[in-house]
Amino acid sequence: MRLEVDGAPLDVTPQPGQVLRTLLREHGVTSVKKGCDAGDCGACTVLVDQVPVHSCITPAHRLDGSTVTTAAGLGTPEHPHPVQRAFAEAPGFQCGFCTAGFVVTASTLTEDDLADRHRKLKGNLCRCTGYRAIEDALDGVVNTTCAAPGAAIGTSVAAPAARRIVSGSEEYTLDVPDGLLSGSDDGLRRTQALLHLAVLGSPHPHARIRSIDTVAAEALPGVHAVLTYRDDPGVLFSTGRHESRLDDPDDTRVLDRVLRFRGQRVAAVVADSVRIAEQACALVHVDYEVLDSVHDPDAARRPGAPLLHGDKTTAEHRIGEPARNVVASLHGGTGDVETALSASAATVDGVWTTGRVSHAALETHATRGWVDPDGRLVLRTATQVPFLVRDEIARVFSLDPAGVRVVAKRVGGGFGGKQELLTEDLVTLAVLRTGRTVQFEFSRRDEFTVAPTRHPMRVRVRLGADADGTLTALHVDQTMDTGAYGNHGIGVMFHSVSESVAVYRCPVKRVDAESVYTNNLPSGAFRGYGLGQVVFAIESAMDDLARELGIDPVELRRRNVVVPGDPLVVTDPHEQSDLRWEGSYGLDQCLDLVEDALAGPLPEVPRMDGPELSGPGLDHAADWAFGTGMALAAIATMPPRGHHAHTSVELLPGGRYRIGVGTAEFGNGTTTVHTQLVATALGTTPDRVDVHQSDTDAARHDTGAFGSAGVVVAGRALYAAAQALRDDLTARALALVAARTPRTASGVLGPAVVVEPEGVRVGAELVGHAELLAEGPLIAHASHDGTPRSLAFTVHGARVAVHRPTGEVRVLQSVQAVDAGTVLNPEQLRGQVEGGAAQAIGSTLYEEVLLDATGRVTTDAFRSYRVPKISDVPRTQVLFADTHDPLGPLGAKSMSEAPYNPVAPAVANAVRDAIGIRPYRLPMTRDRVWALLADATDGGGA
């Protein structure tokens, strides 16, 4: 059959049952993305005869004679469609993976449609932005501008990739047809014909493989290899990645004979197509010895419980207590908490629980691997940590790290989920076995059922205070379900009780925390890295304490938060820390800003699906109860134990600069800020700075993009390299001028020297780039280890309405004040805060990965796992404290993870204010809030 695709004819023969999305991508149309393959997210939206459709559920065989238009067909980076230009200038994206679909849908909207945008765009999801920037794009609002030479800091510069993203031409992980082309900026030739990998998952939560028969699978035409535990390289590792691999337990194998959660790999098939590989998986015959399983962390620690890793040891594998299923624990404090509580004028004691949350990044985990002509293993993969992936792959497979290259193109969302090694190891095993190019791509179901989630926690908080509100005792007792494996199970536990506890002054503190193995799917790194769960509990308890004492919640916090000079104590007041008060302090400003915002008029009530807010005024709307809440959070500007970045800046012919940096870009915005920092130091504009990034060939080392370290670590290193290059430029220019300029009698030559876009001006003379480079290359290197660290602060405020008949909670006002130091790019930072708040609202009100009693995930699609839509999220008002942090680049702090943490308790405190009942469990779904109201009505209380 024949189609017209983006103005060109395409003669194709679809496979039986094939959908339009896969057909287009097979023919090199990579602007069409895979987000769900179920018609839920809109990333694959195209126009068929000018009507927007989800190509992932559109049967290809029905389209003979049709005209198909993708984002690439609407316009190009050089000549964008008006809607594409609007999305670039708003900017209506962060990671950008959803943007092509949004642009295609938006291109069809009339003025009347724009007035009904929440309904018209309900089929398009964005995980990053919080939707305000997308609405700005729809309204033609321009939030970006160009920077003057040397003056990019503080300017809302557009992302370097903006025009490519909106036109669908920016490359993501699998946006290559059969391989990488010769002459591409990767320097790689076209690879061999592509093989695909599919996995057979365990049907049991705990089992041992007695035997496995792969004969029938191997006999299927098109199958090249069937991999089982017999092919495992025999090296234990952790999928969680950190600068020091010793931060995580060695408890995982590429393919294990013992299976510890439903869906764990039993076998992997490498075949000519995904379809053949999946068919072969069904032909693998396995005899399982089913073992007892345990799914509750309390039961897992009881004597006689099934042991998940009882064959491992603390000394060798870094597991705290294998005989108790405990990965790690922390027990300690300052003083006697029981005595302090008994002597307090007021006390609070409560237990808060949080559920599993999916990262729900629209680009799923994916890796393509091959061996290049030089014999190096190359992995093109969706990761936040390319260098850490390289090093662990080399260790597990006994390879020289110099013989492994890891490349991450733009990544379609991370949020911590791509700080894992989930696909790269199997692809490596398959490439080494077959010698061919192999691709492994998670389905959306895999993302829900196999990929790690946020750690569910149970947190008991006990607080004591004097009558004037001064804290006298703080006890946190935290239990964390890390699932079947300990990836991040140590780090998240320790981090969750660090800044959340240290932010308050209190003479007596105690922390009891344990991270526990269960036969549930693994948990992992997630935005906030455990702080969000514990902050929810502590800030809720602080709100209850304020009510107990009759003190305003903001005032209670003012009386108890740390101020410069205070020790930052968790359990040991004498512990040495690299956290420094030399950094800025803006928590006091943030409290004031949110307090003032909540005292002001209510913003326009957002239009949302569901019952109308009716009545003559909101305060009298029938069936609705209204409340106000706030919460605060602190977070260190980067992770502890070191975070390293090595960078370079080089002058190119024509006055352009090229930076080499290992940091991945996945919507975190570091690429934009990196160009701003370098342009400012070198007296040029960001558009003249080229970026070679997230490639293990781009720099000597980079720990990766996690812990909000992209600006404060790699950014600081890049700025130092740019300053060093500036000094080299001026020195060379002075030498050139001095060689042809007679010296004065005194021998002093002291004209003004300025680095400009066209060269270096020495007095009145301009030394151009060509002359500078004629003397040899000009390149500078610098590194930074991320120490010392300072603290960033966020305060969130919320006003909510609770619908008593149904339990629905609507956020009417969302405001967050942030202490981010110097704001390098205001629009980009605003977007990070809005996106973090929107993600947190989702996990506060409805997002939860649910498991049945046997560990089976029951929310395995976007239709059962609700991600906020454009109609769900209020606009978050973002306020900046006026601070300057001398520890960060040009005074900046990190601010990617911080906005997430205070949102849940702020909303929960507002719900408590509205209905008079304390919610203790996240998410606060309609059913749960309704049950609270029903119990109170029936006399059951909260």
Predicted regions and their residues:
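Signature of N-terminal electron-transfer/Fe-S-associated modules in redox systems
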Residues: M1-A152, S167
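Helix-loop-helix junctions that connect adjacent transmembrane helices in secondary transporters/permeases
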Residues: L308-F397, V563-R656, T858-D872, Q877-L879
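C-terminal catalytic domains of large/alpha subunits in multi-subunit enzymes
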Residues: R230, S398-G403, R433-V438, A467, ...
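Glycine-rich loop/linker segments at domain edges
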Residues: P91, A161, R241-P249, R318-T367, ...
